[in-house]
Amino acid sequence: MTNKIGIIGAGISGLTLGCILAKDSKNCTIYEKSDGPSNHGAGISLSPNIIRLLDELEILEKVEKESCLPIDIVWRDNVGKVIREVNVSEFGKLITTNRKILIKHLLDKYISLGGKIEFSHELVEIKNEKELLFQNGNEDSVDFIAGCDGIKSFVRSNYIKNDSPRFTGYTAWRGIGTSDSKRINIYLGPRSHIVCYPINNSLETSFIGVVKNNYKNNESWREEGTHNQLITDLSDYGDFIHSLFKSSEKVFRWGLYDRDKLNNFSKGNITLLGDSAHPM
């Protein structure tokens, strides 16, 4: 009988690992605490490394059709003055998209490869590094465990004791508004910066603003804030940025947290991937 691999978490790292293993005919199951696949919208940029992997998984073309391929990156100061421009082709293709688009195609590919996934399975205990106990009362036995369960990783808490996320002193804001710019724009200001980029061909533009402050809010990127709070935190930028903020239906904020560096991401039959291993 082949070894069974248990993947904890159905985010980007968990689904990507699942696709790779399923493509190689490995026996794996993904366990996800949510009751279904993530449909939370957030912008994400895909660099050449992940683009090559998506191509190997034969889903690159599908992702590209629902995404944007910016041609240049522009650095600006907080009033919009151009500091530097770089053509993306100088270092390879870059894709900007919505996180839920990437999740959808990774999940579809994983299922098509025969991969198994269990939703509503929140891991609450690991016994003998093999026995998985879930909140819903179910249990399962695996030979290897891959912790892909994010910065609040339950797997990591079993892997390393007394290791808690550490607040960096920065808060991030995100949202999806509208803009006709097809560029990646990076604005640099006092104690802060903002990154904006298109995520499809329908004028939808993702933005993320990072500002230094002492507000230790939850590290979850799904905590909703208000437009007024956002504009107050990033008041050093002009109306051209604030109008983008106001065009978003909702805005979200979260504290940026880090963890101590690990000398090894694997211990015994347990391996950490993604934010559970290296959140920053």
Residue locations for each model-derived region?
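Conserved N-terminal helical subregion
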Residues: 2-5, 20-22, 47-176, 214-231
